[in-house]
Amino acid sequence: MRMAHVADVHLGHALMNLRSREEAVMETFERLMEEVRECSVDVLVIAGDLFEHARPKTEALYLAVEKLSELKEDGVEIVATAGNHEIRRRKGAVSPISVLERMGLVRHLYYSERRPERHRYTATFDGVRVTFHGLQYLPKNSFVERAKVIRAKYRPDPEADVNVAIFHQALPGTIPDESEIVEPAYFPEGHDYYAMGHVHVPSREEKIHGSPAPYPGSPEPLTFLEVKDERGAHKRRGFFLVEFDRGGLVEYEFVEVEWSRELSVVEVSGERWEEELRRRVRRGQIVKVVAKDTGASPEEVEKVAIEAGADRCVVELRERRREVEEGDETEGPLDLEGIIREGVKRARAATLTRVDVPDDVVVEVALEILRGVREDNPPDLGDVEGIVAGEPPSEGSEESSEEPEESDGEEVGLEVEEVKVESRGTSSEGMSRAGSKLGSSGRPSLDRWIG
């Protein structure tokens, strides 16, 4: 039997609030679905974040219904779990994945202490019995604290020929944010294939307990950081085509899908930067220009890019520090506040978004950080970077301020002391704290995170 593994489509995403970016994401999704249909798969697995928002835009929902309906008409089974963008944030809210299930389009898998069998679905394809086990996204701390129950509940089905586990979590080495990384030791063992989501760049190198745990990535790059690899080449985009037989996994390969190429990162440097920029910008592109040692202002660089045909332009200046020659004297102390204020001004111009936080607040926070660094006691940065960029508060901060949903009263042993990880994961001190919290009757229920 054949399975398509996709993730992180983010229908409804619009970089810098540009309609063209929203359309690019949808158009690439249409091409992705056409490729999936051409591969004649038996099942499509969506490993989270089909949508950008828990309450998706009408056009995004309509397109998903249209394309998934076409697959269902072809006889394709669709199995999905919710990513962090689709998790309900208040009691009584409904995930868009649940809406698709109610329409008969997908099998929505998630773990709930009230409905313990919702995480598993078994079907037979061409004589191959397959059991899918799906878990909605959990913040790292929630995943680690519940590791033992997850490992117990998500054991492979011994009666199945193939077991596929679906997770929306980040493994070590996939993203730089350590607060999101979950070590493989916390995941259940024994599955033939781990269909992963949450990481936007494709990767097939990851393993969980010796089995493949690949990430298909986002079909359309969502940020400038996702456009090119370290060699400057465009990153591949697409999905994984996986083949199983009654003996388990046969093979899996990455199927490329053409994306818009609308986003571009252009690096220019030196005195001839203007000529180089005009040559490399294509009409209609949304460009991030990294200008190294040009001596130009952001406004000058942006003007040239727009004249060359760019639709929008974000500028990043990189200037080498000029060394002070022996005998030179400075005219006084650095005006840190002035430097920061100018940086905030440029950051706001570069993001092209409206920000309600006053400049004075951002400057004061930045000065406080610098004072802490100087005292060798840096404060918690929190959402400072997001404030400057005009981003909403992080999910972590939203989670901490949210009242957890009430538990259904079912007692589940959630101690995690049997799970061993390397030192780069959660510390032993942190593990013991987690263990002490989990025995209390007032623990938050996993139902809080139902997608």
From Swiss-Prot:
This is DNA double-strand break repair protein Mre11. Binds 2 manganese ions per subunit. InterPro entries: Calcineurin-like_PHP_ApaH, DNA_Repair-Maintenance_Comp, Metallo-depent_PP-like, Mre11_archaea-type, Mre11_N. HAMAP family: Mre11. It comes from Methanopyrus kandleri (strain AV19 / DSM 6324 / JCM 9639 / NBRC 100938). The gene is mre11. Mn(2+) 1 binds at D8, H10, D49, H200. Mn(2+) 2 binds at D49, N84, H168, H198. It is an enzyme of class 3 (hydrolase). One of its GO terms (molecular function) is DNA end binding. Its cofactor is Mn(2+). Its EC number is 3.1.-.-.
